[in-house]
Design a protein with these regions (language model features):
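A generic hydrophobic-segment detector
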Residues: 115, 125-170
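Cleavable N-terminal export/targeting peptides
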Residues: 1-23
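Outer-membrane pore/translocation modules
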Residues: 20-37, 98-125, 163
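Transmembrane beta-strand segments that form the barrel wall of outer-membrane beta-barrel proteins
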Residues: 22-35, 54-64, 144-154
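A cross-taxa feature marking solvent-exposed loop/turn segments within ectodomains of secreted
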Residues: 21, 36-38, 50, 84, ...
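Residues that define the transmembrane beta-barrel architecture of outer-membrane proteins
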Residues: 22-24, 37-41, 69-73, 87, ...
Length: 170
């Protein structure tokens, strides 16, 4: 399995193209949410409107921690600044929708003194404003790695989301 993964990575990295208006990219990311205190996985799609401006749609799922799981879907815009050969930084601005699901066991003490456990479930969804920044390093003309930090501003549930990922440009 490891040999197959290395072969696929080598094949992908050997392809070449340049980033310009109309280009697209697909990627995956590992994320961490400060409010949920959990890690998650995400997928993203990018479209280059110009050589410097790209839009990004992403979906992240944060694994359950202490009875809470979360997912978000985002639409962000990046303005790419060339800092050095193959290295770019960018601000992040956009909108998102976040959804939290929670499951907790609650111990109920009845009037007669008996105890019973009841499961308490629920979910909440809210719109978010995303603000942050990131950095990207091109491993090849098509493959890049990135690190990003964004603040999800959500009514009563602001969260810092940190992510690292890889993207393939085509």
């Amino acid at each position: 399995m490891k040999k197959l993964l290395l072969l696929v990575c080598a094949a992908v990295m050997s392809l070449s193209a340049s980033a310009q208006a109309g280009d697209k990219a697909l990627g995956a990311q590992l994320v961490f949410g400060s409010k949920t205190n959990s890690i998650g996985l995400g997928v993203k799609g990018q479209y280059y409107f110009t050589d410097q401006i790209r839009g990004e749609a992403s979906f992240d799922y944060f694994f359950k921690n202490q009875g809470i799981s979360m997912w978000d879907i985002n639409a962000n815009v990046h303005y790419l600044f060339d800092v050095a050969d193959k290295f770019k930084v960018y601000p992040v601005a956009g909108l998102g929708y976040t959804n939290w699901s929670y499951t907790n066991d609650v111990i109920v003490i009845e009037e007669n003194g008996n105890k019973r456990t009841t499961e308490f479930k629920g979910s909440n969804g809210r719109l978010a404003v995303n603000l942050g920044g990131g950095a990207e390093y091109a491993l090849t003309d098509n493959v890049s790695v990135n690190a990003e930090a964004k603040w999800q501003i959500v009514n009563n549930y602001n969260q810092l989301v940190l992510g690292v990922g890889v993207a393939y440009k085509f």
